[in-house]
Amino acid sequence: MRRYARITGTGSYLPPRRLTNHDLAAELAQRGIETSDEWIVERTGIHARHFAAPDVASSDLALEASKKALEAAGCQPQDIDLIIVATSTPDMVFPSTACILQNKLGANGCAAFDVQAVCSGFVYALTVADAMIQSGAASRALVVGSEVFSRILDFNDRTTCVLFGDGAGAVVLEASEQPGILASDLHADGKHVGILCVPGNVSGGQVLGDPLLKMDGQAVFKLAVGVLEKAARATLDKAGLTDADIDWLIPHQANIRIMQSTARKLKLSMDKVVVTVDQHGNTSAASIPLALDHGVRNGQVKPGQTVLLEGVGGGFTWGAVLLKM
């Protein structure tokens, strides 16, 4: 009998500190940087975001989201035999944030590692976990996206610092006799490294290069819309389904314009798109599981529905996962 994987629980966590656009504009004004609620909303659809306290790390946010996902799945940390954390803001250079999370959670002994594909990280991590469960290498996986992007933002650059927030989302993925993950499609193109990156690195005890995020927003937008449509169609083709079979689209919550363009290309109304970017901002690898959990807990996303997850991020990376809840 073929072995499949399905999501049995979701969870998410946002740090308590919430900054509206007005709050952020006031803080930036002290640096001599001008912006406004109107300017941010018009270009991004973002109204607010959450920032973690200075002593809070990605693993701390991941821990809270994981606890909620485990509770929703009705299992204990000791029941998990695989932990994958998608993050581009790890606690340390090494070991992995997954290992740190494992210890905080009390799930010691299982396999644990990080996946780094920036904002595409969660769809990459979910695809890897699905493959490991299908192969028999794992039976119950905890897949997490967690970020503290506030640590790598250049608050002198209003075109980027207004976009991002901190948060975490998690799912429990279990072996199943019935398909849950229906298909996936992952890609990358390294020639676009420079359009979204943090170019600095640690060497000899020093940070060499710029340690803050750099982005060519127009280049990212143009590339993202095209590759997201292709990934969606490839994933649907693999599953033998069409646009009409999608109950919910949960894209990476980067920018409302990218999300609207993707929905149009897939002939979906925005009523079928789970949107959290307005209140969370862009939380990178955390954005998709955060939005999924939001949709589940507010009653939008229901058992048996077909959901398309899509991510796009630095690298340049992109991908999609089609699943049945």
Swiss-Prot record:
EC number from the UniProt entry: 2.3.1.180
NCBIfam families found in the cross-reference section: fabH, PRK09352.1
Protein name as it appears in the record: Beta-ketoacyl-[acyl-carrier-protein] synthase III
Keywords: Acyltransferase, Cytoplasm, Fatty acid biosynthesis, Fatty acid metabolism, Lipid biosynthesis, Lipid metabolism, Multifunctional enzyme, Transferase
Top-level taxon of origin: Bacteria
GO terms under biological process: fatty acid biosynthetic process; secondary metabolite biosynthetic process
Keyword Kinase: no
Subunit composition and interactions: Homodimer.
GO molecular function annotations of the record: 3-oxoacyl-[acyl-carrier-protein] synthase activity; beta-ketoacyl-acyl-carrier-protein synthase III activity
Recorded catalytic activity of this chain's protein: malonyl-[ACP] + acetyl-CoA + H(+) = 3-oxobutanoyl-[ACP] + CO2 + CoA
Chain ranges passing through the membrane: none
The keyword Cytoplasm appears for this protein: yes
Matching CDD domains: KAS_III
Gene: fabH
Region ranges (ACP-binding): 253-257
